[in-house]
Curated annotation (Swiss-Prot):
Pfam families the UniProt entry points to: GHMP_kinases_C, GHMP_kinases_N
Biological process annotations from GO: isopentenyl diphosphate biosynthetic process, methylerythritol 4-phosphate pathway; terpenoid biosynthetic process
Domain of life: Bacteria
Active-site residues, record numbering mapped to chain: 8, 133
Binding site for ATP: 91-101
Function, as annotated: Catalyzes the phosphorylation of the position 2 hydroxy group of 4-diphosphocytidyl-2C-methyl-D-erythritol.
Family from the record: Belongs to the GHMP kinase family. IspE subfamily.
Name of protein: 4-diphosphocytidyl-2-C-methyl-D-erythritol kinase
Organism, scientific name: Clostridium botulinum (strain Langeland / NCTC 10281 / Type F)
Involved pathway(s): Isoprenoid biosynthesis; isopentenyl diphosphate biosynthesis via DXP pathway; isopentenyl diphosphate from 1-deoxy-D-xylulose 5-phosphate: step 3/6
Gene3D superfamilies: 3.30.230.10, GHMP kinase, C-terminal domain (3.30.70.890)
Amino acid sequence: MLSKAHAKINLSLDVIGKRKDGYHLLKMLMQTIDLYDLIEIKKIKKDIIIDCDREYIPKDRRNLAYKAASLFLDRYNIDSGVRINITKNIPVAAGLAGGSTDAATVLKIMRDIFEPDISNEELKEIALDIGADVPFCIEGGTALCEGIGEKITSIKNFKNQILVLVKPNFGLSTKDVYNNLKVEKIYIHPNTTKLIQSIEEDNLESVARNMRNVLENVTLRKYKTLNSIKSNFIELGALGSMMSGSGPSVFGLFDDMLKAQICYDNMKEKYKEVFITRTI
């Protein structure tokens, strides 16, 4: 069984506190985009086997797709295994939920193969044990995600919007970025309410003005390349530009495909991983 595993971007990312167990409390507006990996799963007699077209992708429990399959098989006492083939298109360690969306897609395919009556809500319970972005990736679309990612409220779909996405030639550790964030020193927070209102009113310029990611407080200071990419996007006609998730991917939001294509061509001269895509 073959399925697409779509990446996500953040239209906003706010950190509003930190729990005693170390988890940060988040308020994020998440959006699925039309950039995806391909996941194919076949039922086998035993074990979990991961195949991938990228040699650097781990094939063991470090891979979230493996973890998803293992949790699913254990939870439902399934006495067989799966072979998972992953074709990667989403950049790795990029703030685009590449591993999380693969895991979510594995859960959905395995439901179809083994336990078709399981609800999305039940899948999200398993998903939260894998990672904060995985529950959102079960549903996709446009949603406000709060807590540690478990509180998901769907809003009007912000679909068919034009994006150019740049992944610079380095990856970032989500854990390291959050560990270097000083919550008490976040002085400007996203106006998430205004951002949602702008989406509901189809006001693209207001959406662009209200996009904000507090993790840029960490990354923009350390990686000047990210400042340069954001500035280049605005110079090349983007309505707004922001880092997605914990980075380092940066996207520009456009209202015109010709401008987006010119921007893409320009960025492609400087960076290897550049994409034109849309929200879905």
